[in-house]
Swiss-Prot record:
Its EC number is 1.5.1.5, 3.5.4.9. HAMAP family: THF_DHG_CYH. The gene is folD. NADP(+) binds at G164, R165, S166, S189, I230. Transmembrane segments: none annotated. Pfam families: THF_DHG_CYH, THF_DHG_CYH_C. This is Bifunctional protein FolD.
């Protein structure tokens, strides 16, 4: 039976360590500061932002919320980003996605100062990642790597298959895996013989947002399975992209949904906010 990779326990440890680091930074008059820009009133975004603020408050990160109305123009949003870029007291900027229709997300991402880009979405951050240079990366991939590390799962030399090619998970995770000496394949909706490809993976990452997309017939015995997806079934129950009940008996390790990758994402956001604050403190 697979070991369950407990993201709640690992993230709790990360946050406790960060709280200690933040207390030490405070002795040097440094307070990690995260600016969150929320445009409109998307219910899911409201929940995500509230969770981020709660975690920030718990560990001593200063979290500033900038709410903008649904009717915000592109020019007004870019002006707010520019204002935050030039504020010397702000270490990290996060514009909560998705943005309302009519706003150009990529233009907004491009406008964020790469040295404050805590999401790691800017072209400069992406370039640094693929050049294997120190950089901030998207929180979910960062969290996945931290979770694997916590369980001493070494990716070097492993065959990694990532199903999903989003800029939020699949692509940046591929970069991190390559930088840690894994052999990586990204699969997607146009990939042929997807199940056979998945079954060749030593580490299988699934991020497609389709409940129980992967079953036992697509997993190699002994594989590590990372389930990034989260959906609600007809009964309201949270479901992952992987059928855990079917896959757990043959995998060596698996992330549960909920309680696997999800908690690691916010912990990673906090960790990288602290990293950016340290850079500011060190000039």
């Amino acid at each position: 039976m697979a070991t369950r990779l407990d993201g709640r326990a690992v993230s709790k440890k990360i946050l406790a360590d960060l709280k200690q680091t933040i207390a030490e930074l405070a002795q040097h008059d440094v307070t990690p500061t995260l600016a969150v820009v929320l445009v409109g009133s998307n219910p899911a975004s409201e929940v995500y932002v509230r969770n981020k603020q709660r975690r920030a408050e718990d560990i001593g990160v200063r979290s500033l919320m900038f709410r903008m109305p649904e009717a915000t123009t592109q020019a007004d949003l870019l002006a707010k980003v520019a204002e935050l870029n030039h504020d010397p007291d702000i270490d990290a900027i996060l514009v909560q996605l998705p943005l309302p229709a009519g706003l150009d997300e990529q233009a907004v991402i491009d406008a964020i100062d790469p040295d404050k880009d805590v999401d790691g979405f800017s072209p400069v951050s992406v370039g640094r990642l693929w050049a294997n240079e120190p950089t901030v990366v998207a929180s979910t991939p960062y969290g996945i790597m931290a979770l694997l590390d916590a369980y001493d799962i070494d990716v070097a030399g492993k065959r990694v298959v990532i199903i999903g090619r989003s800029n939020i998970v699949g692509r940046p995770l591929a970069g991190l895996m390559v930088n840690h000496d894994a052999t990586v394949t990204i699969a997607h909706s146009k990939t042929r013989d997807l199940k056979q490809l998945a079954k060749e993976a030593d580490i299988l990452v699934v991020a497609v947002g389709v409940p129980h997309f992967i079953g036992a017939d697509a997993v190699k015995p002994g594989a590590v399975v990372i389930d990034v997806g989260i959906s609600r079934g007809a009964d309201g129950k949270l479901l992952g992209d992987v059928d855990e009940a079917a896959v757990a008996p043959i995998a060596s390790a698996i992330t549960p949904v909920p309680g696997g990758v999800g908690p690691m994402t916010i912990a990673s956001l906090m960790a990288q906010t602290v990293t950016l604050a340290k850079r500011r403190a060190n000039g």
